[in-house]
Curated annotation (Swiss-Prot):
Gene3D superfamilies: CD59 (2.10.60.10)
Tissue: Expressed by the venom gland.
One GO molecular-function entry: acetylcholine receptor inhibitor activity
InterPro entries: Snake_3FTx (IPR003571), Snake_toxin-like_sf (IPR045860), Snake_toxin_con_site (IPR018354), Toxin_cobra-type (IPR054131)
Keyword Disulfide bond applies: yes
Domain of life: Eukaryota
Record-given protein name: Three-finger toxin W-III
Keywords: Acetylcholine receptor inhibiting toxin, Disulfide bond, Ion channel impairing toxin, Neurotoxin, Postsynaptic neurotoxin, Secreted, Signal, Toxin
Organism: Walterinnesia aegyptia
Signal sequence residues: 1-21
Family, as annotated: Belongs to the three-finger toxin family. Short-chain subfamily. Type I alpha-neurotoxin sub-subfamily.
Summary of the function given for this chain in its UniProt record: Binds to muscle nicotinic acetylcholine receptor (nAChR) and inhibit acetylcholine from binding to the receptor, thereby impairing neuromuscular transmission.
Paired cysteines (S-S): C24-C45, C38-C62, C64-C75, C76-C81
Length: 83
């Protein structure tokens, strides 16, 4: 019984990862680097780039969104990989 209980505790710890949250950069364009803790178990970061009347625009954040044609998208799976 003790072995079963210990096994359940270990499996729970491994599955929950002790509350660790995934971290991605979230600064826009040429702003100083900032990060955000991703919610909902998200484990990907993205960087979107496009040009408009303001010039070259960069957006960073958690997840991997769907983008329109003409927008460059880079999604990655390690923390802070989207700088």
């Amino acid at each position: 019984m003790k072995t079963l209980l210990l096994t359940l505790v270990v499996v729970t710890i491994v599955c929950l990862d002790l509350g660790h949250t995934f971290v991605c950069h979230n600064q826009q364009s040429s702003q100083p680097p900032t990060t955000t803790n991703c919610s909902g178990g998200e484990n990907k970061c993205y960087k979107k780039q496009w040009s408009d009347h303001r010039g070259s625009i960069t957006e960073r954040g958690c997840g991997c969104p769907t983008v329109k044609k003409g927008i460059k998208l880079h999604c990655c799976t390690t923390e802070k990989c989207n700088n």
